[in-house]
Amino acid sequence: MVFGKRYRDKETGIIYDENGRPCKTCNIFSSFRNVAQQPNSSTVPEVKSNTQLESKQSSIDCNTNAIPDSVSFPRLPDVAELGRSTWTFLHAMAANFPKNPTPTQQNDMSSFLYNFSKFYPCWSCAEDLRIWMAKYGNSPRVDSRESLCEWICEAHNDVNERLGKPLFNCQVWSKKASELAD
């Protein structure tokens, strides 16, 4: 196993970061729970580096005195929950963007979107967004509320298409979203 690159374990489906640690935001909470509840025996996958060993041990050791299911505690969202919340946020933000933004507002929004694509908690999702944004014609359109709404919709459609979900009519969506914000 080579560290320094993010990857998904084919057996467990868990996504690991470049240091060999599970990406908590990218993985569904139940996946961590299942791995953590594995007995500390020969059924645990072979470990090929100290970093991987420490990672697997800490995930197991942290859960030996697990909190009962009846106790509520904060948790990170799984990737699907994170995605739904993110699209709600981005569509709402675009719908509330000024109809005629100043050059400063345009610059701020463009910077936000580029930075957002660098720091989004799901690294593979962030990378997909950066790749999409780098394609010709896909840089953020921030010259008006309607153009930003349409751009967010197109980005959302790119994700929906890869996931096999229905696509939005972005021209209709951007007009409706802009009207709702007024």
Curated annotation (Swiss-Prot):
One Pfam family in the UniProt entry: Evr1_Alr
InterPro entries named among the record's database cross-references: ALR/ERV, ERV/ALR_sulphydryl_oxid_sf, ERV/ALR_sulphydryl_oxidase
TM regions (residue ranges): none
Cofactor needs: FAD
Record: residues binding FAD: 81-87, 91, 120, 153-165, 176-177
Enzyme class: oxidoreductase
Subcellular location field: Mitochondrion intermembrane space
Keywords, comma-separated and alphabetical: Disulfide bond, FAD, Flavoprotein, Mitochondrion, Oxidoreductase
The UniProt record lists the keyword Secreted: no
GO BP, sorted A to Z: mitochondrial disulfide relay system
Principal place of residence: mitochondrion
This protein's GO CC annotations: mitochondrial intermembrane space; mitochondrion
Annotated ranges, domain ERV/ALR sulfhydryl oxidase: 75-177
Enzyme Commission identifier(s): 1.8.3.2
Record keyword Oxidoreductase present: yes
Function: FAD-dependent sulfhydryl oxidase that catalyzes disulfide bond formation. Required for the import and folding of small cysteine-containing proteins in the mitochondrial intermembrane space (IMS).
Protein name: Mitochondrial FAD-linked sulfhydryl oxidase erv1
Protein source organism: Schizosaccharomyces pombe (strain 972 / ATCC 24843) (Fission yeast)
Gene: erv1
